[in-house]
């Protein structure tokens, strides 16, 4: 292809050359072309060019001459405004310039005459002035007419006389709440100038009011310009300006109102600082007298209140003198006055709050950077501080209020004074070591009405729990509160008195020390109370041991015959005292906590420490349900054996997983000794610095019960248990946070599988989780299909039934654990359960559910034996006696009145049959637990 291309190009080139040669040969010569006129002759002589140039210039000259001949005369041109008349040219511009200069001079003079004076500029924050000078001007209300002449001011600045106008305007008192006074709190002259401001009750709008000159001058002497620092040159300027006013009055014919509009770009006057009508000015001596009387009355009222009730030690001294103070006092061991005053604590005397808005200063958030500039200014304005400046300056002005607010809750919710036997970490960190405290805790609650029935006179709870549980779900120590008589009053005062946002303006160190000493006394008393209760519990244990020793040997329970791994009670049940034998009809027996321990908050949940009877080792598993509403009464919730049977599924974060023995194994316990298996159910929600619910995950180490009889392990001492509890209480933290955020607990598949393989089925009638509460007698008749009479030895043991019921229902015993029972699949579920009960005990046991109001949660309580799928077990969730109104109705240790009645409690929150353990997610029971948080 390249050869062909090159040959082709060579051919074309040769052809082009031949054609070009032919054209060059045939073309005409230059002369021929010139003769034919195609091109000009190249060699024309120079004379030809000169002649041509001359002809062109002649032609141009001819045209000019022709135009000059034909042009119009000057008159026509002037008429047509092409030319101006030479006579009018010079005088007109000169006159115009003179007129223009005169007009400019007039305008300038007018503006100078009407421009605002320096004091006016200072008042409107247009002119930057030293703070002391500004406050001197504002404190004395030194005012000038706005149109004073500046030139005269400069000329007469040395004059010394005060004109009548000047004395009148200088002496008119301004309102204490005016923007001039509210900015006084930060200047170095706050002390003396504050008194001057507070004694004046007029307003700056009434400068021109005609008051008697002699009275005004005497007032001026009383107000005393001595401490005002640098106002003296200002006074000189003021006098000269007022003297020059009379001379220059003719220069201000115009109304100055339109000129004010030009200032709107320089200055922002907030709405609450705009000029308002104020009462007529008062004589300053009379005003001082009135304010002294007012102060005296306020102090008298406060002293009377403090005589009758203890005042909260954290209140600031200056706040006792401020108006609009509303004390929500709690008449218990200490009280917190929640004062809401619109005054800044920098002023120690009253200012009549005429110009300041009536907003109450709420608590400041912990981080001032989050606030916008407008919000910062609003807070400053409420507190009577200057609102000008950059954002950092505004935040610096607000910092003292933020530090002194003493409010543990950062949001602007209502603050309710709550008397819990609780020691939250962020409120009272120095009381964590106390065994039981009745400490005050400001729960910031956005719900205004606490969910507490006023009918309960023995509650020591006066307020609502925090919506975002600040320190975990606070459970309360179950001890008779020493302030029962006052609790109802405090409850009513907190319900009716409303919640006031406090601004506690500082905690004095002395009063802090007093509070700490009071707290120590309270701690000692509660410790003594706890010791007494522990002694009572030990006596109770001995009584139970004696009864256990006298009991005849019983047949083993058929439905509790599966082997269950046993956890060391000493390691996992720190607060449990001596184990007790629990009668068969109640699978959850009392575990005595060391009387309400506020430093270790009790778990709110249903963690019934289940003690099996002498025949069975029962593995109990932690189940926490922090329900907050009091109508979910937990009493009567532990009456059926299903209540404490639950599958050990790791899907459920509330259950501690435990692997049980083979389903077919049976361990018959022939000794009357009972083994108590508790898994550290006192989840020590003690005060720790971390907020959020904390649950202990004791990581149970269960030893397979090789022998039929398990020895009774003595519980550890109280101090050891507390130490164990403190280490365990933080292990469920992350787990619960993840659970709440993601909605499910990350389950260990292997452990889950092993647990599910070992859980047998229970034959019986299947029931949905929302089944209504059936009659217990029918249920148990249905359950006892082929039964051995497991409870025949108890048929005449009515007193023992009652003792068990008392144990299981006593509020001190309900540190409530849910026990996990592994049930052999080859045995009937509840053989002879109803037969074994004496009539009275059975009635007392089961009728409580029918006496009480209906089920209170979507998942109704249920007593029927329920068959589950191949991997399920019936679950019973019982609520701790946390919300019931009678759980604090305890008697002194010698008596058992508080433990006597079963029918006083309400039904449990819910009993649920989980039909599938693998499906154990938050959709069924966990929602009910978490919806209250």
UniProtKB/Swiss-Prot annotation:
A motif (MEF2C-binding) lies at residues 12-27. Its main location: nucleus. Residues 515-550 form a coiled coil. Residues 248-265 have a biased composition (Basic residues). SMART domains: RPEL (SM00707), SAP (SM00513). RPEL repeats lie at residues 18-43, 62-87, 106-131. The modification Phosphoserine is found at residues 445, 449, 453, 457, 621, 625, 629, 633, 810, 857, 864. Transmembrane segments: none annotated. GO terms for molecular function: transcription coactivator activity. Disulfide bonds: none annotated. Residues 330-346 have a biased composition (Low complexity). InterPro entries: Myocardin-like, RPEL_repeat, SAP_dom, SAP_dom_sf. The keyword Hydrolase does not apply. It comes from the Eukaryota. Residues 210-220, 347-357 have a biased composition (Polar residues). Expressed in the heart and in smooth muscle cells-containing tissues (aorta, pulmonary vein, lung), but is not detectable in skeletal muscle, liver, kidney and spleen. The modification Phosphothreonine is found at residue 891. It holds the Pfam family SAP. Residues 712-933 are annotated as: Required for interaction with and ubiquitination by STUB1. GO terms for biological process: cardiac muscle cell differentiation; positive regulation of transcription by RNA polymerase II; smooth muscle cell differentiation; transcription initiation-coupled chromatin remodeling. Ubiquitinated; by STUB1/CHIP at the C-terminus, leading to its degradation by the proteasome. Phosphorylation by GSK3B is required for STUB1/CHIP-mediated ubiquitination. PANTHER family: MYOCARDIN, MYOCARDIN-RELATED TRANSCRIPTION FACTOR-RELATED. Homodimer. Interacts with MLLT7/FOXO4. Interacts with SRF, its association does not depend on specific DNA sequences for ternary complex formation. Interacts (via C-terminal) with EP300 (via the CREB-binding domain). Interacts with HDAC4 and HDAC5. Interacts with MEF2C. Interacts (via C-terminus) with STUB1/CHIP. Interacts with PURB. This is Myocardin. It comes from Sus scrofa (Pig). The gene is MYOCD.
């Amino acid at each position: 292809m390249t050869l062909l291309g090159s040959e082709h190009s060579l051919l074309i080139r040769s052809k082009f050359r031949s054609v070009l040669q032919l054209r060059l040969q045939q073309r005409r010569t230059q002369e021929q072309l010139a003769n034919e006129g195609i091109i000009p002759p190249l060699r024309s002589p120079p004379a030809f060019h000169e002649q041509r140039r001359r002809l062109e210039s002649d032609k141009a000259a001819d045209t000019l001459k022709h135009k000059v001949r034909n042009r119009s005369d000057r008159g026509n041109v002037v008429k047509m405004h092409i030319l101006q008349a030479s006579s009018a040219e010079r005088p007109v511009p000169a006159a115009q310039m003179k007129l223009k200069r005169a007009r400019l001079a007039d305008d300038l003079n007018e503006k100078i005459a009407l421009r605002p004076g320096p004091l006016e500029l200072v008042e409107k924050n247009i002119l930057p002035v030293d703070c002391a000078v500004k406050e001197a001007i504002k404190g004395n209300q030194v005012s000038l007419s706005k149109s004073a002449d500046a030139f005269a001011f400069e000329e007469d600045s040395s004059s010394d006389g005060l004109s009548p106008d000047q004395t009148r305007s200088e002496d008119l008192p301004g309102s204490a709440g005016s923007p001039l006074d509210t900015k006084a709190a930060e200047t170095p002259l706050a002390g003396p100038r504050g008194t001057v401001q507070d004694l004046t009750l007029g307003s700056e709008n009434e400068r021109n009011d005609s008051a008697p000159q002699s009275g005004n001058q005497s007032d001026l002497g009383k107000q005393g310009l001595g401490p005002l620092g640098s106002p003296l040159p200002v006074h000189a300027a003021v006098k000269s300006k007022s003297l020059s006013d009379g001379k220059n009055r003719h220069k201000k014919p115009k109304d100055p109102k339109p000129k004010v509009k030009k200032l709107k770009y320089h200055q922002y006057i907030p709405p609450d600082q705009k000029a308002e009508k104020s009462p007529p000015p008062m004589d300053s001596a009379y005003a001082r007298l009135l304010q002294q009387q007012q102060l005296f009355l306020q102090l008298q009222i406060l002293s009377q209140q403090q005589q009758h009730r203890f005042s909260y030690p954290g209140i600031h001294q200056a706040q006792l003198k401020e108006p609009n103070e509303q004390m929500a006092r709690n008449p218990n061991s200490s009280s917190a006055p929640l004062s809401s005053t619109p005054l800044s604590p920098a002023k120690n005397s009253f200012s009549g709050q005429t110009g300041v808005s009536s907003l109450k200063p709420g608590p400041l958030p912990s981080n001032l950077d989050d606030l916008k500039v407008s919000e910062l200014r609003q807070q400053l304005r409420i507190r009577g501080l200057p609102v000008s400046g950059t954002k950092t300056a505004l935040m610096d002005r607000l910092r003292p209020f933020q530090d002194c607010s003493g409010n543990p809750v950062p949001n602007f919710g209502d603050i309710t004074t709550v008397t819990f036997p609780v020691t939250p970490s962020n409120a009272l960190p120095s009381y964590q070591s106390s065994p039981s405290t009745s400490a005050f805790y400001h729960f910031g609650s956005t719900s205004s009405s606490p969910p507490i029935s006023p009918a309960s006179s023995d509650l020591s709870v006066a307020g609502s729990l925090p919506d975002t549980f600040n320190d975990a779900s606070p459970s309360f120590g179950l001890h008779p509160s020493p302030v029962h008589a006052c609790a109802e009053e405090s409850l009513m005062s907190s319900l009716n008195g409303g919640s006031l946002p406090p601004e506690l303006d500082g905690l004095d160190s002395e009063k802090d020390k007093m509070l700490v000493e009071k707290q120590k006394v309270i701690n000692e008393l509660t410790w003594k109370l706890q010791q007494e209760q522990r002694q009572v519990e030990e006596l109770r244990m001995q009584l139970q041991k004696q009864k256990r020793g006298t009991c005849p040997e019983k047949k083993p329970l058929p439905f509790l015959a599966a082997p269950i791994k046993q956890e060391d009670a000493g390691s996992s049940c720190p607060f449990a005292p001596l184990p007790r034998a629990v009668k068969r009809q109640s699978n959850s027996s009392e575990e005595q906590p060391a009387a309400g321990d506020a430093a270790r908050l009790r778990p709110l949940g249903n963690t019934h420490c289940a003690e099996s009877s002498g025949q069975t080792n029962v593995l109990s598993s932690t189940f926490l349900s922090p329900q907050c509403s009091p109508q979910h009464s937990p009493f009567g919730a532990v009456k059926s054996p299903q209540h404490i049977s639950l599958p050990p599924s790791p899907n459920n974060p509330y259950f501690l997983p435990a692997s049980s023995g083979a389903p077919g194994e049976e361990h018959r316990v022939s000794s009357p000794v009972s083994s108590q298996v508790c898994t550290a159910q006192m989840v020590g929600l003690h005060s720790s610095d971390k907020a959020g619910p904390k649950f202990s995950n004791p990581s149970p180490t269960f030893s397979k019960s090789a022998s039929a009889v398990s020895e009774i392990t003595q519980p550890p001492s109280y101090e050891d248990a507390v130490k164990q509890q403190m280490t365990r209480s933080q292990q469920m933290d992350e787990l619960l946070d993840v659970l709440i955020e993601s909605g499910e607990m990350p389950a260990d598949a292997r452990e889950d599988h092993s647990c599910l393989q070992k859980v047998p089925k229970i034959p019986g009638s299947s029931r949905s989780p929302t089944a209504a509460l059936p009659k217990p007698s029918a249920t148990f008749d249905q359950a006892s299909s082929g039964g051995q009479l497991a409870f025949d030895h108890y048929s005449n043991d009515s007193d023992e039934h009652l003792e068990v019921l008392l144990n299981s229902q006593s509020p001190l015993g309900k540190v409530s654990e849910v026990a996990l029972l592994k049930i052999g699949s080859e045995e009937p579920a509840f053989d002879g359960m109803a037969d074994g009960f004496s009539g009275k005990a059975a009635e007392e046991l089961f009728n409580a559910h029918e006496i009480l109001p209906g089920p209170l949660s979507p998942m109704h309580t249920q007593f029927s034996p329920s068959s589950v799928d191949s991997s399920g077990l019936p679950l019973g969730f019982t609520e701790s006696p946390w919300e019931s109104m009678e759980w604090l109705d305890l008697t002194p240790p010698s008596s058992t009145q508080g433990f006597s009645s079963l029918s006083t409690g309400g039904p449990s929150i819910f009993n649920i049959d989980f039909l599938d353990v693998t499906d154990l997610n938050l959709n069924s029971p966990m929602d009910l637990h978490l919806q209250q948080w």
